[in-house]
Amino acid sequence: ITPDCPFIDPEIVDNVIEYFLKHSDKFDYVSNCHPPSYPDGLDLEIMHLFTLETAWKNSVDPIEREHTTTHIWKRPEIFRIGNVCMSEEKNLFMTERWTLDYPEDFEFTKQIYENLYHNGNIFLMDEILQFLSKRPEIKKINSHLCEYNSVH
């Protein structure tokens, strides 16, 4: 989970953690972003400590030094990689941008929080999707940036 992801959904986190724990003997690394299917900004990665240590020790590329897990998922011949997808028929990665990199992303984030966050409540992915379906003008604030959605 990275700091530019202000809408992390605890149910998605629980699902990916449960999958990793259930299959920890089969995978060194599990994410929900290789391949991506959730909205950009709901991505998370889980790995064994030895996997992270191996990546840290062997990463020489500057990108891999900044984004250590890149070393892992670019080497499926070395690391056993698992992924949790939304569903076979649903992929929101290139149509939903819920990350915080540009001023438009900040305005989008501000609008979501002003409309959905009240008295410390937690709101989830489905609530954001429902809200955006009723308020498409908010989705348009940063939709032109979806082409920049990426996984590090």
Q: Predicted regions: what is each one?
A:
Residues 44-56, 103-107:
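Conserved nucleotide-sugar donor-binding
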Residues 69-152:
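Conserved alpha/beta core of the MobA/IspD/sugar-nucleotide pyrophosphorylase nucleotidyltransferase superfamily
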Residues 32-43, 91-92:
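A recurrent flexible, glycine/aromatic-enriched loop bordering the glycosyltransferase active site
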Residues 61, 65, 74:
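Active-site cores that bind ATP or allylic diphosphates and position pyrophosphate for catalysis
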Residues 37, 54-62, 119:
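Short helix-to-loop capping/linker segments positioned immediately adjacent to catalytic or ligand/cofactor-binding
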Residues 1-3:
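Active-site acidic Asp-centered loop
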Residues 41-42, 47, 67, 95-96:
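A conserved catalytic-core signature of glycosyltransferases
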Residues 5-37:
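Conserved donor-nucleotide/metal-binding helix-loop-beta segment in metal-dependent transferases, i.e.
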